[in-house]
């Protein structure tokens, strides 16, 4: 269903029954639950007859299966026309199943079938969209840089048949929406997983442009000369140390219906600004990082990746709001031309900043982008970045921190939890602004304290948000990149977080304002 120039999702179809022909090489994924300390088939009717259910449950009993969440068993079932059945445990039986539980176990199932080309599933009877999303996200692979020696010989999951009793029109729309969302997440993952040798500011900008134009977006790119001329001191300053100059990319989805009078938006239409940090590699600059795990800094453009994927998704889903993404891109390198600790730069808009630590570079490029984004007079501003290591210390590897205007911050965090990305609202105490005082400039880019690092960074960014704009920043320093083992629908490497959160916010704004 994807027409993107990048990631191609499996083909998804929805059926009201198991086809009797053409599925001889397919695997049927069947959810089971824990019932009376044994595994019992769930969501069988009307897709599985009693003989098939009895055969599956008898086989599971002989294996001692309990139906615990994530527990899988591969079975050959003579009563069904498929090659085999994969049972996937949901855990203790309940009346309703949260969407992310369905999404997560679908991801587990897909990962356990990594050499299977075609699957069918009755998980979709529990939640059609969540099952499709989970299967696509769980089957994600990044193999672009594998040679013939190590590349997978199979093509991975290419076809999904979701079994559902939904009406044809509802099923078609749900399948397309789920495919589009999962494709957006996979696109963000691809960006994050692409090494900095191949994804530097100019190349990143070109790929963003290709995606944007394919989705019908308006695209603008400012090169290094244009950035200097326009006064983007933060982006220029961070990029000074690299031989690969910085860029600023603007992607615009004009979904709000215009009136005839001067192109004004009607009262019910909203404009949302998105800003994402695009540091294609971060050494820390002159304030250089430790060598251990520096290779993970290929993910320091995770915020930009998610923002680009989200605005493309908004266009594909034809959201009736304006969404304008402003994406600064730079490489933070040490060299004879790099900015130094103690330098003073002028952010776009005129604020002067004493750079006490060149490894606090993300906030410098974001501040420029925030000011530019606010010139579009948005109703809402959502930023995201791999902002601070302090996010990881405070919230761990899977929980983004959300800072911003109190009501909008809470709205973003709530929606993030609903879609399974599980962000947590964080405060911005007013007294932290005193920690950013400078004796030579308007602001310092870091405080002199090692405490509250995430909140101090958020306080810095707040200084650049225009009055009256509802604002939220999502810090995904650890959640954007999974350095551990895969789990659920989340692979090792780029995760695509917080693409689904931002899209959920955009959808709610489109519905409710």
UniProtKB/Swiss-Prot annotation:
* Cofactor(s) named in the record: Mn(2+)
**Positions contributing to Mn(2+) 2 binding:** 277, 282, 300, 361
What does the record's cofactor remark say about binding?
Binds 2 manganese ions per subunit.
Catalytic site:
289, 363
**Major localization class:** cytoplasm
Q: Which UniProt keywords apply?
A: Aminopeptidase, Cytoplasm, Hydrolase, Manganese, Metal-binding, Protease
Q: Which InterPro entries match?
A: Leucine_aapep/pepB (IPR011356), Macro_dom-like (IPR043472), Peptidase_M17_C (IPR000819), Peptidase_M17_leu_NH2_pept (IPR023042), Peptidase_M17_N (IPR008283)
**GO MF term (any one):** metalloaminopeptidase activity
Q: Which Pfam families match?
A: Peptidase_M17 (PF00883), Peptidase_M17_N (PF02789)
Question: What catalytic reaction does the record list?
Answer: Release of an N-terminal amino acid, Xaa-|-Yaa-, in which Xaa is preferably Leu, but may be other amino acids including Pro although not Arg or Lys, and Yaa may be Pro. Amino acid amides and methyl esters are also readily hydrolyzed, but rates on arylamides are exceedingly low; Release of an N-terminal amino acid, preferentially leucine, but not glutamic or aspartic acids
Its BP terms in the Gene Ontology are:
proteolysis
Localization, per the record, is: Cytoplasm
GO terms for CC? cytoplasm
Query: Which residues does Mn(2+) 1 bind?
Result: 282, 359, 361
Task: Provide the E.C. number(s) assigned to this enzyme.
Answer: 3.4.11.1, 3.4.11.10
> What SUPFAM superfamilies does UniProt report for this protein, alphabetically?
Macro domain-like, Zn-dependent exopeptidases
- Enzyme class comes to hydrolase
Q: Which domain of life is it from?
A: Bacteria
* Role according to the record: Presumably involved in the processing and regular turnover of intracellular proteins. Catalyzes the removal of unsubstituted N-terminal amino acids from various peptides.
Record NCBIfam families: PRK00913.1-2 (NF002073)
Q: Which family does it belong to?
A: Belongs to the peptidase M17 family.
Classification via PANTHER family: CYTOSOL AMINOPEPTIDASE, LEUCINE AMINOPEPTIDASE-RELATED
Protein's name according to its UniProt entry:
Probable cytosol aminopeptidase
* Native organism taxonomy: Bacteria, Bacillati, Actinomycetota, Actinomycetes, Mycobacteriales
The gene designation is pepA
């Amino acid at each position: 269903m994807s027409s993107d120039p990048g990631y191609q999702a499996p083909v998804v179809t929805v059926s009201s029954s198991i086809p009797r022909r053409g599925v001889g090489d397919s695997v049927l994924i069947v959810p089971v639950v824990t019932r009376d300390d044994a595994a019992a088939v769930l969501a069988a009717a009307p897709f599985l007859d009693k003989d098939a259910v009895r055969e599956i449950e008898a086989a599971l009993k002989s294996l001692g299966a309990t139906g615990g969440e994530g527990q899988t068993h591969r079975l050959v079932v003579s009563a069904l026309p498929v090659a085999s059945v994969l049972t996937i445990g949901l855990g203790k039986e309940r009346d309703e199943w949260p969407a992310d539980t369905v999404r997560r176990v679908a991801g587990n199932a897909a990962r356990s079938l990594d050499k299977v080309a075609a699957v069918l599933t009755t998980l979709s009877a529990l939640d059609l969209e969540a099952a499709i999303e989970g299967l696509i996200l769980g089957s994600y692979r990044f193999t672009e840089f594998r040679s013939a020696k190590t590349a997978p010989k199979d093509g991975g999951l290419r076809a999904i048949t979701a079994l559902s009793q939904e009406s044809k029109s509802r099923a078609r729309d749900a399948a397309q929406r789920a495919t589009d969302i999962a494709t957006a997440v996979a696109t963000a993952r691809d960006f994050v997983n692409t090494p900095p040798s191949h994804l530097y500011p100019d190349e990143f900008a070109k790929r963003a442009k290709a995606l944007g134009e394919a989705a019908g977006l308006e695209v603008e790119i400012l090169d290094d000369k244009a950035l200097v001329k326009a006064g983007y001191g933060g982006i220029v300053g961070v990029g000074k140390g690299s031989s690969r100059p910085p860029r600023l990319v603007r992607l615009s989805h004009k979904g709000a219906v215009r009136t005839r009078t001067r192109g004004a938006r009607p009262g019910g239409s909203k404009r949302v600004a998105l800003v994402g940090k695009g540091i294609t590699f971060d050494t820390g600059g002159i304030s250089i990082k430790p060598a251990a795990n520096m290779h993970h800094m290929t993910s320091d453009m995770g915020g930009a990746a998610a923002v680009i994927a989200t605005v493309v998704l908004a266009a594909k889903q034809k959201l009736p709001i304006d969404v304008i993404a402003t994406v600064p891109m730079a490489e933070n390198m040490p060299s004879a031309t790099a900015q130094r600790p103690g330098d003073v730069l002028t952010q776009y808009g005129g604020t002067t900043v004493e750079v006490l630590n060149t490894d606090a570079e993300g906030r410098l490029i974001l501040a420029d982008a925030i000011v530019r984004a606010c010139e579009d007079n948005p109703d809402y501003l959502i930023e995201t970045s791999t902002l601070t290591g302090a996010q990881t210390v405070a919230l761990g590897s899977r929980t983004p921190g959300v800072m911003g205007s109190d009501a909008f911050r809470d709205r973003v965090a709530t929606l993030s939890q609903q879609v399974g990305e599980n962000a947590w609202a964080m405060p911005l105490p007013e007294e932290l602004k005193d920690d950013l005082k400078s004796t030579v400039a308007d602001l310092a880019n870091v405080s002199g304290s090692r405490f509250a690092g995430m909140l101090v960074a958020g306080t810095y960014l707040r200084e650049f948000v225009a009055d009256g704009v509802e604002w939220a920043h999502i810090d995904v320093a650890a959640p954007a990149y999974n350095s551990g083992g895969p789990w659920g629908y989340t692979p090792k490497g780029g995760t695509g977080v917080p693409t689904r959160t931002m899209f959920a916010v955009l959808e709610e704004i489109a519905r409710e304002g």
